[in-house]
Swiss-Prot record:
Subcellular location field: Cell membrane
Oligomeric and partner information: Heterodimer of a large membrane-associated beta subunit and a small pyruvoyl-containing alpha subunit.
BP GO terms, sorted: phosphatidylethanolamine biosynthetic process
Modification after translation, per record: Is synthesized initially as an inactive proenzyme. Formation of the active enzyme involves a self-maturation process in which the active site pyruvoyl group is generated from an internal serine residue via an autocatalytic post-translational modification. Two non-identical subunits are generated from the proenzyme in this reaction, and the pyruvate is formed at the N-terminus of the alpha chain, which is derived from the carboxyl end of the proenzyme.
EC id: 4.1.1.65
Gene Ontology cellular component list: plasma membrane
Cofactor(s), names only, from the UniProt record: pyruvate
Family statement drawn from the similarity comment of this UniProt entry: Belongs to the phosphatidylserine decarboxylase family. PSD-B subfamily. Prokaryotic type I sub-subfamily.
InterPro entries in UniProt: PS_Dcarbxylase, PSD-B, PSD_type1_pro
Name of the protein this chain belongs to: Phosphatidylserine decarboxylase proenzyme
Co-factor: note: Binds 1 pyruvoyl group covalently per subunit.
GO molecular function list: phosphatidylserine decarboxylase activity
Function: Catalyzes the formation of phosphatidylethanolamine (PtdEtn) from phosphatidylserine (PtdSer).
Native source organism of the sequence: Halalkalibacterium halodurans (strain ATCC BAA-125 / DSM 18197 / FERM 7344 / JCM 9153 / C-125) (Bacillus halodurans)
Amino acid sequence: MRKTFFRLCFELSSHPVLSSMLQAFTTSKASRWLIPSFVRVYNINGQEAEKPLHTYQSLQEVFTRTLTENCRPIDLSPKSIVSPVDGVLAEQGTLSDEANFVVKNQTYTLEEMLGGKEKAKLYREGTYLLFYLSPSHYHRIHSPVNGTIKEQWTLGNKSAPVNNLGLRYGKRPLSRNYRLLTELEAEEGRCIVAKIGALNVNSIVPTHQSEHVDKGEEIGYFAFGSSVMLFFEKGTIQLDHQPRAVEVKMGEKVGSWLR
């Protein structure tokens, strides 16, 4: 019962009234008494949190917690591409020559995902990775590569769940939900970090301050349930993992540049 309640709080309903009520509650001090239960239900490692868990003032503060320094070692190999988040690497593969990709038996077009034909053409036959974050995960987002931010834009106005059931039975939530997309240019090629929210504009908060970002540097955080997708140009990277769901940590190597 408690896990169902917490899942409602952080993955949220697509109904706007319920979503607003849950958001108001989880960000208020009234939710503080639920922190111990939340920590137990999701097995949150308090030793990793930057502050003692009893000092947080709301469920939201625990959910968006920062970690202690060096808690997540960054793979600094020159050619490495690292996971931008703690989560499940749920899907990965190659985009079709028509720039399509399939997640949970649903076909997505990159044109809809990125918001335009010209941008989609750049990544046709490229590589994609999908990371799903559950309420138990650390919800800060980090850069997967060293690079310069070339462009950042927002798309979408839906708020469907992006959990396993939402991805399977929802109406293309990855390309319809509100999302913040950041295109990075590295020496080896370009990539797009697509941060997909499950509530509204306030569910994704950018934190980077400069145009250049280092691999592993924080670039934002999710206030509520979420997913992240990475897109790379054709022939620029090689993936590390087999195409099956695998738990990964932020900073862990998930691929390599080929150039």
